[in-house]
Amino acid sequence: YNINSIALRYFNPIGAHPSIKIGELPLGVPQNLIPFVTQTAAGIRKELSVFGADYPTSDGTAVRDYINVVDLAKAHIAALKRLINKTNKKSFEYFNIGTGKGSSVLEIINTFEKVNNIKLNYKIVGRREGDVIAAFADTTIANKELNWKTEISLEESLKSVWKWQQKQSV
């Protein structure tokens, strides 16, 4: 059939659109850290649980790669252009889409508190079964082949997601 495709393997999307009209609103219990952070800051949740502080990381908490949703959207556009322009090298390609840098749970909490001037109520609890120590993207191939890289900082992402959460609370 001569069908070409590209799969984007993204890591942890965070942030909100700059208009603050689009953001993450999980129904029920969130499955990601950032909604727990914002909902705790907004008073929707009493306390944020940090699962494990005994990992072999800089502060003992798990590490993940957090990518802004706008950077993620731009990666999709870059992949589509590659297909439209027929510059793909194989009929099926895949790319890691992330920042290439890991941030620990406590780094996320501390950065969120700092950039938004708010204190979070959190506690350290035991590890969750199945959680890995660290997961972050090697974006070397995506950077080169898609001519794409992230532009939005963790700080900007955490500011935007808090602005979005506050708008939901109004």
Which stretches of residues belong to each language-model region?
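C-terminal substrate-binding subdomain of Rossmann-fold SDR/epimerase-dehydratase oxidoreductases
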Residues: 33-170
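Conserved beta-loop-beta element that borders a ligand/cofactor-binding pocket
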Residues: 1-19, 47-51, 89-90
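Hydrophobic, Gly/Ser/Ala-rich alpha-helical and linker tracts in large acyl-processing enzymes
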Residues: 17-30, 37-40, 46
